[in-house]
Amino acid sequence: MAEPNFAPGLEGVAATQSSISNIDGAAGLLSYRGFAIADLAAHSSFEEVALLLLDGVLPGAADLERFDHGLRAHRQVKYNVREIMKFMPVTGHPMDMLHCAVASLGMFYPQQELSDAERGNTLHLDAMAMRIIARMPTIVAMWEQMRFGNDPISPRPDLSHAANFLYMLSGREPDPAHTKILDSCLILHAEHTINASTFSVLVTGSTLTNPYHVIGGAIGTLAGPLHGGANQKVVEMLEEISSVQQVGAYLDRKMANKEKIWGFGHRIYKTRDPRAVILKGMMEDMASHGNLRHSSLFEIAIEVERQATERLGAQGIHANVDFYSGVLYHEMGIKADLFTPIFAMARSAGWLAHWREQLADNRIFRPTQVYTGEQDRRYVPVAQRT
């Protein structure tokens, strides 16, 4: 029997066929369902992009209104889930809370697997996806209140997806400029082809388990430091630098020790990350109009971006989406440990689109392995072992 090919991390292995998103890493291009990400960020909304990812076409007015109404109507989280959250340690990371809370939603799902009829019912799958997308921001915002001893703030059906989340975080009317920033960030983080968390969606979904298990697994995967969390690391890095005057020495030390500079470079993009280009322009525009608080950390970030680009730009290493989203979230007053849960809120749309695509032509994942262990060993009773 021929030895199977071994590709560590499945790098370069096409594990699926997909029509959801596409990346041209050499040209620095990203598209959702064939639409350039720059056009979607400029003209669309997260609600519309989520439905585009799920259904494959730009929705008409009636379909978009139906989906948007459904999102607003399903923001409330069952009281039992809130009770579960009460017993979680407030010192835990919000991603651990989100993983647990989303998994608990599956307790209210009547079946542990999808029937043939359900898998073929587009409206049914849309409804399940809509409920998850609607409730994840509520869970994150509830936790932000509960971990500081406050009662959760009820969602408002008169607000958009992004605006409602900002309202539930603070209890204040959301700033329109901040709402636009968050909406754009949600669009830019909504989908990015097959990465670790999306691959976990395919593997878990291929078993025909319910979508709460599928998304719970993806959240757990995203929580790993090699996948999600980079924008939180960006803010921690900027706080460590502490002043504009220290930027050069910090970068020199990191480069001399061949250590990672958070928020720079990308495994796929060989030029500028198109999402980063959009967010940088937005950051500059918002700052010039006084819509960001312009903290000392913001000034450090601008200098890090300038000096790091001078040192690394010729190698094709530029600031990525995590660098700018981390800075923008910080300037909006959002705590750093909420950055990855917000990433998960956005990516839920892409995850669920891939879940649906997997169900449409399902085959359970069963890769092989290259065995490297010993053979034909003889069992020795414990009394005779030396």
From Swiss-Prot:
Record keywords, A-Z: Transferase, Tricarboxylic acid cycle
Pathways involved: Carbohydrate metabolism; tricarboxylic acid cycle; isocitrate from oxaloacetate: step 1/2
GO molecular function, one term: citrate (Si)-synthase activity
UniProt-listed InterPro entries: 2-MeCitrate/Citrate_synth_II (IPR011278), Citrate_synth-like_lrg_a-sub (IPR016142), Citrate_synth-like_sm_a-sub (IPR016143), Citrate_synthase (IPR002020), Citrate_synthase_AS (IPR019810), Citrate_synthase_bac-typ (IPR024176), Citrate_synthase_sf (IPR036969)
Residues forming the catalytic site: 266, 322
SUPFAM superfamilies, A to Z: Citrate synthase
CC per GO annotation: cytosol
Entries under PROSITE patterns matching the protein: CITRATE_SYNTHASE
Record Gene3D superfamilies: Citrate Synthase, domain 1 (1.10.580.10), Cytochrome P450-Terp, domain 2 (1.10.230.10)
EC annotation from Swiss-Prot or TrEMBL: 2.3.3.16
Tagged with keyword Repeat: no
Keyword Transferase: yes
Alphabetical list of CDD domains matching this protein: citrate_synt_like_1_1
Gene Ontology terms: biological process: carbohydrate metabolic process; tricarboxylic acid cycle
Annotated catalysed reactions: oxaloacetate + acetyl-CoA + H2O = citrate + CoA + H(+)
NCBIfam families per the UniProt record, alphabetical: cit_synth_II, PRK14036.1
Comment field (misc): Citrate synthase is found in nearly all cells capable of oxidative metabolism.
PANTHER family: CITRATE SYNTHASE, CITRATE SYNTHASE, PEROXISOMAL
Family listed: Belongs to the citrate synthase family.
Protein name in UniProt: Citrate synthase
Source species: Acidithiobacillus ferridurans
